[in-house]
Amino acid sequence: MSLAVVILAAGKGSRMNSNKPKVLQTLTGKTLIRHVLSRVEPLNPDNIIVVTGHLKEMVEADLADKKVTFVEQKEQLGTGHAVLQALPYIKEDKVLILYGDVPLISTDVLANLIKSASDDLAVLTAIVDNPTGLGRIIRDKFGAVSHIVEEKDATDGQRQIKEINTGMYCVAKSHLDDWLPNLGNTNAQGEYYLTDIVAMARGDNISITVTHPVEEFEIQGVNDRIQLAQLEREWQKHIAEVIMSKGVSVADPSRIDVRGKLEVGKDCWLDINVIIKGHVKLGNNVVIGANCILKNCTIEDNVKIKANSMVDGSIIREGAIVGPFARVRPECDVKEGAVIGNFVEAKKTILGRGSKASHLTYLGDSEIGANCNIGAGVITCNYDGVNKHKTTIGDYAFIGSDSQLIAPVNIGSGATIGAGSTIVSDVPADNLAISRARQRHIDTWQRPVKK
């Protein structure tokens, strides 16, 4: 059977007190609506419809790279009315209905909901400790679902019910064609509730199947920044537990932030306040110090990233050491056993096997061979104000402290650069190059005297 997915994303989210629509608030570094799409796309639906409303242009811009159809709900008249706007654009047999502000529903739970629907109606419900504000599932004396009542319309007795409606359904398109045009708005909100299709299904003797999420956070919606922060911590705790189960030690599971995809080896150690962005791969026995940021990088076995360091878009090879207070910018390849030390910045640089830049250095657009020593304060001067230029350093070279290498320049293997030199031309292999003013001693000099 063909499948359409309808994602409701028209709400204002006034409690966010924001200039952005609610679905564009971010969780783990990604907008809420993109979280929902990332969980839907593996289902390979034939059609994805996003119902927009408040600041629709911003939502459309955020999803410009996605293959979706946008449908506008011009008036906010309820969830049933929102799905009704999408109905003319649905040609598929089944319809999965989701919410753009419920970001963490898992693909597996959705797949089970779709499977359970068969040709009829499947409802995702959950039993929660605190159902306040949520629609309650009303069952008959035989335990079958009869209808859903919203909190504002519920009696005191119904408000004691712990089973709640998540708002997620999978239903045959033919049933929506029958039910949605007949929704009423005689309720406390004066809105057209999508929840009323459950009672309609019951009235038409349509089978109603109930499925449940695995984790409660999967069905948690976001209405304000407090809930957003709480859900962020719930999700980060879940991620921490997952990576710990794979053999990673986390110093404090409440102080880790994974804002992308993290692949881990065994026996790694993550200290407090580590932030992961994009796609990060960690090998075995990797140590990440406190307050580090890793983004779109590969960290191989036995690497140490010391405290307060950043690695972005680069690869750190086996046994290398980075930091503390180091910054590895995109397109770097730090080879096996190499060292990027404290207050060293590297950009688009290959640092060869066993080479060391231990302190206070800038390496940009550089290719450095094996077993080199880069002294403190060395600068590769790669930018002429318009273009970037390359510095090449051969194996076993020694670059003395406080030297400037004016690119483009080649330093031969085994060459030595005297401390404090400014190198403007190529240095042959095994040569000493020194470029600095001759030291003078003036024994007749006297300090000035204050008058």
Swiss-Prot record:
UDP-N-acetyl-alpha-D-glucosamine binds at residues 8-11, 22, 73, 78-79, 99-101, 135, 150, 165, 223, 329, 347, 362, 373. Residues 247-451 are annotated as: N-acetyltransferase. GO terms for cellular component: cytoplasm; membrane. InterPro entries: Bifunctional_GlmU, GlmU-like, GlmU_C_LbH, Hexapep, Hexapep_transf_CS, MobA-like_NTP_Trfase, Nucleotide-diphossugar_trans, Trimer_LpxA-like_sf. Keywords: Acyltransferase, Cell shape, Cell wall biogenesis/degradation, Cytoplasm, Magnesium, Metal-binding, Multifunctional enzyme, Nucleotidyltransferase, Peptidoglycan synthesis, Repeat, Transferase. Disulfide bonds: none annotated. The active site is at H359. It catalyses: alpha-D-glucosamine 1-phosphate + acetyl-CoA = N-acetyl-alpha-D-glucosamine 1-phosphate + CoA + H(+); N-acetyl-alpha-D-glucosamine 1-phosphate + UTP + H(+) = UDP-N-acetyl-alpha-D-glucosamine + diphosphate. Catalyzes the last two sequential reactions in the de novo biosynthetic pathway for UDP-N-acetylglucosamine (UDP-GlcNAc). The C-terminal domain catalyzes the transfer of acetyl group from acetyl coenzyme A to glucosamine-1-phosphate (GlcN-1-P) to produce N-acetylglucosamine-1-phosphate (GlcNAc-1-P), which is converted into UDP-GlcNAc by the transfer of uridine 5-monophosphate (from uridine 5-triphosphate), a reaction catalyzed by the N-terminal domain. In the N-terminal section; belongs to the N-acetylglucosamine-1-phosphate uridyltransferase family. This is Bifunctional protein GlmU. It comes from Francisella philomiragia subsp. philomiragia (strain ATCC 25017 / CCUG 19701 / FSC 153 / O#319-036).
